[in-house]
Amino acid sequence: RNAAYGMRARANLVMNNWGEAATDAEAALSGYTFLSKDDVSAPGFNSANSPSWIWAGIYKAADTPANYRNITWGGHLCSFARGYTTSQGLYKRINSLLYNMIPDTDVRKGWWINASLESPLLDHMDWDGVTGSAISSLAIPNVKRAFQPYTNVKFAPYENKCGTDINAGDWCIMRAEEMLLIQAEAMAMGGNLGGGKSLLEN
C-alpha cells in the first residue's frame, strides 16, 4: 500500500498536482523512518530490512547461481565483492569536480574515497585482515584490483563479507527519503514554501 502511494506521489509530482503529491508522499511515509547519519556512515544500501526502504527487489544468494554471480547489481556496483567491478578494476567513480563540490560536513562525501584513497566508511570494513584505508591499495590476483581515486564505497557486500563471490543484495526501488523530498517540493511548489522548507530542515 505504501509503495502504491509512493508511485502515485511520483506521478502527481510530474503532473504538477502539488497537493495530491504531498498527500500521497506523506501516506507513503507512514510506518517508515529515515536513515540516521550513523546508518549512512558505513557501507550499506543492500538490504530491504532497512527501516527507510518502502519498496525493494529481494535478491538472495539462491538467486545468484555461480555462473551468473557477476551480472548482478552487486557484481557491478559493490567495490567489496568478487565480481566484474573488483576483478577488472571497473569501479564506479565520481568526477573529481563534483566530488570537490560536496561539503566536507556532508556525510555523503564519504561514499567515495578521496584522491588519497581514504574514506571514513572504510573503517567499517575488513578484507581478510586488511582494514580501513589499506583496503584501497589491496590487490589480489583475479579477485580485486586496487581502488582508483574517487571509487564508490557506498554499497556493502552480501552479508557485509568483503571478498564474497555471492553478489546478492536487495535493490532499492523506493525510500522514505525520496517521499520526504517529494512532499517538501510539492508543498513549496503548491505555494507553501515555508512549510516545504521547514519539512526539509526539521
Residue ranges and their predicted role:
Residues N17-T23, G190-S198:
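Structural helix-adjacent loops and short alpha-helical linkers that scaffold large soluble proteins
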Residues N202:
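CBM-like carbohydrate-recognition segments
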Residues N2-S41, I54:
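Aromatic-residue-lined binding/catalytic grooves and analogous aromatic/hydrophobic interfacial grooves
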Residues A27, T33-G191:
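Elongated scaffold/linker segments in the mid-to-C-terminal portions of large proteins
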